[in-house]
Amino acid sequence: MIQLSKCIQMNEVNSEYEALFSVIHPILYGLVMSLKQDIVSQIGGYKNMSLGMFTRMYVPGDGDCGICFEYAVHNAIISKNSDVLNRIDDALTKYCKIKGTDPSSILFGAEKSGQVQFIDSVMEHLTDDSLLLTGKKGQPIKLKKHINGVAAAFRKPKEREKLPSSINGLWKADLFVGNTLQDKWVGTTVKINPSQLESARGLRLGIVPSRQGKSDKITQHETKNLIICPVPYDYSFMEIFYEGWDIVKQFINAKSEMPKEINLPGSLDRTVCKHLVDRKNYNVLDVIEYLKSMAQPHLLDVANESANIDSTVTDKKISVNRIVAPISSLMY
């Protein structure tokens, strides 16, 4: 069980300055709440924790929080957002030999920057007959049979050698997208930046945000064996989230001091970060409330909920216990 913060876009980004405060406060709150509670109790609770103290207590990977664009795509599919579903259905039907009117998604890589690969109820969604289609000649792979090996391969390169050669890159998948009635699926990679799409054996579908002024045509990449499927998304909204994430991370890495310019070179980013530096001696929850007051009004609606995400990895505790998922208004 992990905590999920859905940051749902309600309006367009009007002011980058105010928008950064809008996204920083749920990110910072998520990181603060991800601290181990026994450590928080030792100082008498959050009421005794300053922002600067938090940066010294925080250990990356020791109860962490991640931004997850993959979840935004996954959520749009399972919530049956018609604009997104139509795009996915076209890609599956025309290019992946998976016909049907009700595409579905299984979230596989909930947080790739953590130390553990998560499986989101994979065993509930897959059957013993679930087939993985790779776009290559040969018999389809029975996915459930190999799912534990794929998860292990994410963490241990040596485990990749144990996978069938046709899917030895499947550990790079973010989602499995397909049709539950046909019980056919494709390994799917999700990237905010299309140039970061990479081929790997076992991957078939590449989902990227559509961009204004660019073609949103579904295409088959000539060399990567990937079907590229742009989906509606407010690109500027996503950029703001990653920019805000970087500001918070650099501030933490600098232990509440102003980060070196090489680490945070943008003038606007440094201006926003200075608000954090100037308040390092104030209570961390009070600082978060201050950040809310500086935010663009009505840009975000933050909904917190618990999510069942099961890990197939048994030799290590889950290191990521909270996900911040930016969800564009075009996807909701």
Question: Across the structure, where does each feature detected by a protein language model lie?
Answer:
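Catalytic cores of nucleic-acid endonucleases
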Residues: 154, 162-170, 190-277
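Long, compositionally biased intrinsically disordered regions
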Residues: 1-39, 247-332
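A short, polar/proline- and glycine-enriched secondary-structure boundary/capping micro-motif
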Residues: 47-50, 97-105, 198-202
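Nuclease-adjacent, charged terminal/linker segments that flank catalytic cores
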Residues: 1-96, 329-332
